[in-house]
Amino acid sequence: MPIHIAFCVNDAYIPYITVTLMSIAENHKDDEVIIHIFSDYISQKQKLRLDKVVNPYPNLTLSIQMVDDSALRGLKDTWTIYTWYRVLLPLYLSNEIHRVLYLDADTIVASNIRELFFMDMSDKAIACVIDPESFNSETYSRLKYDSSKKYVCAGVMLMNLDYWREKDLSKTIIKWGYDHNDIIRFPDQDTINYLCRDSKIVLPLRYGIMDYFFKTDSFYQEPYAQELRDCIEHPAIIHYAGMNPWKRELATSLMQDEWEKYNKMLPHPVKKEYITKGWNLVKMYIWNILHPSPKTSTLTRGDVLNKLNSCQ
């Protein structure tokens, strides 16, 4: 059976997901993988860019589908409407596809994920890693559910499509989003967490590694200590949440080298961009020369392991 992986992006984000695609291709050479890309428009130029990545790998198949997002207009889109597209996947994918792994564009698949994809999901809608918001009491008071149910990150989400279809979850999520626009902070992620609060699996951290884990003391204690060690020693999926690895000012992740490795393998590597541009970039450069900041230490994998060992 093939592994199905989905992305929901606009045309401008295609270059970034080519890095993710390269990481998938390199770590699944013996697996049939079908890549589903959902968008409202993809240019011929970007389609060719995708083909150049996928075509050298005969076990990879690329499927591109256009989405009618009229049902989503009016929903809160703090970042982009495309994040809502993932709730439509059960409606757009064939009923013969029983599950799909949704990935944000700022991810790397650092090892084979067959075991994850075919895990038991009986009577569960989703499987995700815990989100930093799970430790924020305001999250639960705002969404009105118990903290024991946890709050997960939808940026890496294994979806049980049979469950979604049986419960008509896509339509329920969209309706709840409209009805609760006033309390939503993280649009579809809030909605998914609330409606799947009793039907989600919390995955080991290695399946959605975020830098937040390494910078938070609670993850160096049980029940997370061994999972944090596995993030360093056996990384599976890296999620550069809030640290876009293609933005020079944000490319400071502990796992930045993994993104760089796969980017270099591409026929057309992604060129890093500055958030600050033009004259503002020149002014920032001059300011940094005239007002040098004291050097701050950068967290390394060794630092994480040393801290874990000292906490034992």
Predicted regions and their residues:
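A structural signal for isolated positions on well-ordered beta-strands in alpha/beta enzyme cores
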Residues: H4-A6, I34-H36, S63
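Active-site-proximal specificity loops/subdomain of glycosyltransferases
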Residues: K45-Y92
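A glycosyltransferase accessory/donor-loop signature
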Residues: M1-I3, V9, E166-Q312
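Short, acidic, metal-binding catalytic loop of nucleotide-sugar glycosyltransferases
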Residues: S23-E32
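GT-A fold catalytic core of metal-dependent nucleotide-sugar glycosyltransferases
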Residues: I64, D68, Y82-F135, Y151, ...
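Short internal beta-strands
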Residues: I34-Y41, C128-V129
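Active-site beta-to-alpha loop of glycosyltransferases that engages the nucleotide-sugar donor
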Residues: V9-P15
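A short, conserved beta-to-alpha structural element at the edge of catalytic cores
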Residues: I126-D146, T252-Q256
